[in-house]
Amino acid sequence: MADKPSYFVTTPIYYVNADPHLGTAYSTIIADVQARFCRADGYNVKFLTGMDEHGEKVAEAAAKHGMTPQEWTDSQAPHFKQLWETLEISNDDFIRTTESRQYKAVQYLWERMKESGYLYKGSYDGWYCVPDETYFTETQVEKGDEENGTPGAHLCPDCHRPLERVKEESYFFKLSAFQDKLLKLYDEHPDFVQPDFRMNEVRSFVEGGLNDLSVSRTSFDWGIPVPFDEGHVTYVWFDALLNYMTACGYGVDSDEARAELAYRWPANLHIVGKDIIRFHCVIWPAMLMAIDEALPEHVFAHGFLTVRNAETGAAEKMSKSRGNAIAPQDVIDLLGVEGYRYYFMTDVTPGTDGAISFERMEQVYNADLANSWGNLISRSANMSVKYFDGCAPAKPTNDHAFSNPLADVADGIHDRYAAKMGALDYAGAKDEAMALIHAANHYIEDSEPWALAKDESRADELAFVIYNLLEAIRIAAHLLMPFMPTTSAEALRRISCQDEAASDDLAAACVWGGLAGGAPVEKGDPLFPRLEPRA
């Protein structure tokens, strides 16, 4: 375990009040791409996702379907697991907050919070958003009006749905005591919250003053019991945030669990949506400070997915009423799983809201995958079969006078690519791979292998060209592996490099000249058949 550095990446754990959707899939694919890159780059990766099963919202969803909360959450788990399997998600752990390990960890957290002095008992009287499981003060509440059909209503400032007035006995976490400590954290670690403008939002929120947080509920019972006060259950976010440490062995009294926690914690990267950034960048670090635990290194908040209106060009919120809602299966049906992953990771900027459209999906797929990457693989394999009996030419020696522009493009490509992947600049990382692919396609046109094949005196030059094309494919496949693991592995298999697909030394794999000469090359069907325009 400890022979490699640890890299721990997480998604949020997802509410089970409804099926997984495009947004949850987006968060999960981001984390998966990062996990796959880090495994290839030499890290021992733990990639965690899961389900957030407690809280009033889940209890209401269960009642609506005539089930107990546990029955409802059990019925939902297969939907999440099946979609992640379909989308080639490589998570190492799937945590459910109804598991015994989470109960033990949360109850251990309560005991430590009690010892810390940052916990007190009181009464909460204020506004609560059930869909968002969030408390709001009177000054934060949005007032309804005639224009939006909610005159006199108190609305959630985030989701704009009606709030409930809640009055109940509760335990409070002294969040207000951590204002200065949080601001110091942001000053000393300016990359704690990413992108930069999200850090500015978080800082501004904290500078405005923090209220103590109600962390137990007594008006319903679907939650983890507070161990020292019967009738209180844990506030859903106080429970949910701890899942990241639970999965590393927190709260388990064994040498093995303590070793795992020491190795894995703190997390390197939490991937979250911008709507839950305050929980992860304010409440979560304050909780950890209170119990004297290390803080995660980075929290990356991605934007929302919107739909580009084909007629107006405007970005619109997805909704069934507008008829513009897009489900994951809709995208899979159009692009396939690998095209789905590639589009969302390379054409949608993670840090900002991204307007998507089927038209743009087709454009990206055809331009990058069908016309460029897939075409390079097909043409190079076909020429290997035609001119070299289906084998890679011998690896060139250094005693030739031929220029090699592809080796020049590949020089230093790992470091450039890795820097961009580390910064979650997936479009930039993709551009490194596509630069090599485009250069290889231009190389075919410039070198004209078909003409070289007609001149026996230029046989060495032909072999040199075909070898370089296959070597460019090998390196590009490694760079695209985190985005499209199945087709990238297939590209490697077709040039007899299948053993490299599980490589954990990406830097070495990207060194020019790794392709062994004489190995079989297979043509195969097109990896990315061109899409015809939608009717």
Write out the residue ranges for each language-model feature.
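Generic structural concept
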Residues: A370, G374, A407, D411, ...
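Short, glycine/charge-rich beta-strand/loop segments that flank catalytic centers
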Residues: D93-K104, G122-Y135, M199, A301-T306
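Basic, alpha-helical terminal appendages of large translation-related enzymes
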Residues: M1-S6, G50, G122-W127, P131, ...
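Structured secondary-structure scaffolds
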Residues: A2-T49, R101-A105, L155-K386, D431-A433
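N-terminal Rossmann-like or analogous alpha/beta NTP/dinucleotide-binding catalytic cores
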Residues: A2-Y120
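Cys/His-rich short segments
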Residues: S116-Q179, L183
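Long, amphipathic alpha-helical stalk/connector segments used for oligomerization, subunit docking
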Residues: T349-T352, I356-Y365, S380-A429
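A glycine-rich phosphate-binding loop feature that marks nucleotide/adenosyl-phosphate handling sites
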Residues: W127-D132, G303-V307, E359-R360, P393-A401, ...
